[in-house]
Amino acid sequence: MAVRVLVVDDSVLYRRVLTDALKSLPDVEVVGSAASGSSVLPKFRELKPDLITLDIEMPGMSGIEVMEALRREALEVKVLVVSALTVSGGALTLKALERGAFDFITKPSEGSAQENFRCICDELAPRLRAIARRLEVQTILRRGTPPAASVAKTAAVSTPAPLLRRAPIAASAAASNNHQPELVVIGVSTGGPNALQTIFSALPGDLAAPIVIVQHMPPIFTKLLAGNLAAHSKLPVREAAHNEALSPGTAYIAPGGKQMRVVPALNGRRLLQLSDDPPENCCRPAVDYLFRSVANHFPGKALAVILTGMGEDGTAGLRLLKRGGSMVIAQDEASCVVFGMPKAAIEAGVVDLVLPLEAIADRITALVRGSQS
């Protein structure tokens, strides 16, 4: 089943680049394009796309206004924001994500035409695969009882029932080590800004542990995300700085384009270190890079949380954290935008608790305070 895509961009060049990139991907059909926001609704009604790639900064009717119009009309379509790597582009992109955009990609600002084309293809490919999987599941659900082959396929992406049944036992076993978490580490990708906002708006201001976060995002965007989260949280939230000492009750977000690790320092302090080390799992910052540092230097002292996102980043690091006695929480499938990173961790057997997004903040608070309730 091909994903039907409508390309919206006021730039003739980018309409052509995006169209060519999408056409190079399997199971994708570009059904049309639009040069302005005002033409999106008529084009949508005519072409019935599954996905709109939406330039967020357009003259006249902006990308944000397009999203608001789609929401007012209750039109069912995924939106993939296409943004410039600028402060204004980042701020508008975060607004679009708050309004329900599926995800975003950035327009390359450097490199040759061929390199930029390949970069766009690489960014589009996993997102289109994730959208295709969601559309397939939605189609199956609309049909009611799926055929046997479809049941097998959807079962493969569901949270394993045996894991859910044994989760309280696993949680008790982790707690019996008497390792009240001194540090919370979070890994997240697609759907992350809204997921993090849900969690941080519910955390208390007196949480006695620092929180260290890797969110897959480019430079500029992570600093804006930290500001947005701080506005919705009782805790201070900021973009991490090199050699910054961790403070209880403060959250730190890895800067886009940097790897981040936690290392021990004098007097029992913990420092954040940033580097230009190579990407892992095609990501910088990478969740595995952070989790591995915590597992190596602070075994059994962390609570790890893996949230919505594409791919498997975080699973290898969680395996090390579990081996050292740390506890792991994964977001459940129903509340994920993309059930990729949590699914990989669950299937690897490195998760103690699978929880809906709305329950994660309370569980973090209880564990840090030394309560299992």
Residue ranges and their predicted role:
Residues 1-6, 12-23, 27, 38-39, ...:
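Conserved acid/base catalytic micro-environments in cytosolic active-site loops
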Residues 35:
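Conserved residues in the N-terminal Rossmann fold of short-chain dehydrogenase/reductase
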